[in-house]
Amino acid sequence: MSRAALDKDPRDVASMFDGVARKYDLTNTVLSLGQDRYWRRATRSALRIGPGQKVLDLAAGTAVSTVELTKSGAWCVAADFSVGMLAAGAARKVPKVAGDATRLPFGDDVFDAVTISFGLRNVANQQAALREMARVTRPGGRLLVCEFSTPTNALFATAYKEYLMRALPRVARAVSSNPEAYEYLAESIRAWPDQAVLAHQISRAGWSGVRWRNLTGGIVALHAGYKPGKQTPQ
């Protein structure tokens, strides 16, 4: 399977990511012009985690994002449904679990925080995934969604769309182990809702205080919220 369709059949998506795993981190850095490192640091900072806390890094892929989160001193586990991606990150010494975002292999109220970076867009049933994230998070615990979004400047947005549909596939052919997967990436980004719509979807799944912050002119947005309950967010 070289690429998934926009209906996002879980088996097709997992197979697609297995196919890009070998050069995934390099390809991301090249295609983002190095911005992926900044986005990971911003995610860690926005999540506001620290020593003694438990964090689930969902759709963690090769666990490069999980390693960044551990710099906070928190205990972090990487979860992904692509076994190939987890295997590609075997050298990264963090706990790793294979699992589906809509059926997480964890009990209720386990984590102080949950994050998903560039993964929610690849889940067929996003509401189910957001509810599962809430289930495994303690009351007062935090959610951070880092995802591609809609640039706020109209001229920049036009240039960005041209990059997605024209330049990105060409660059992917030069560096990726599965360049056709990046055609899916471009199409899925263009089909993804804007910041306000995603915030509404997160709230509808049971998260409170949902807000967002744009990065790189809105190419990426961080959506944050907390699980309502007796404890208050720290």
From Swiss-Prot:
Q: Which CDD domains match?
A: AdoMet_MTases
Q: Which Gene3D superfamilies match?
A: Vaccinia Virus protein VP39
The terms under GO molecular function for this entry are:
demethylmenaquinone methyltransferase activity; methyltransferase activity
Per the record, GO CC terms? plasma membrane
Q: What InterPro entries does the annotation carry?
A: SAM-dependent_MTases_sf, UbiE/COQ5_MeTrFase, UbiE/COQ5_MeTrFase_CS
Q: Which UniProt keywords apply?
A: Menaquinone biosynthesis, Methyltransferase, S-adenosyl-L-methionine, Transferase
Enzyme Commission no:
2.1.1.163
This protein's record includes keyword DNA repair = no
Q: Which PANTHER family match?
A: 2-METHOXY-6-POLYPRENYL-1,4-BENZOQUINOL METHYLASE, MITOCHONDRIAL, METHYLTRANSFERASE
Please give the function described in this protein's UniProt entry.
Answer: Methyltransferase required for the conversion of demethylmenaquinol (DMKH2) to menaquinol (MKH2).
What is this protein's name? Demethylmenaquinone methyltransferase
Q: Which organism is it from?
A: Mycobacterium tuberculosis (strain ATCC 25618 / H37Rv)
Q: Which gene encodes it?
A: menG
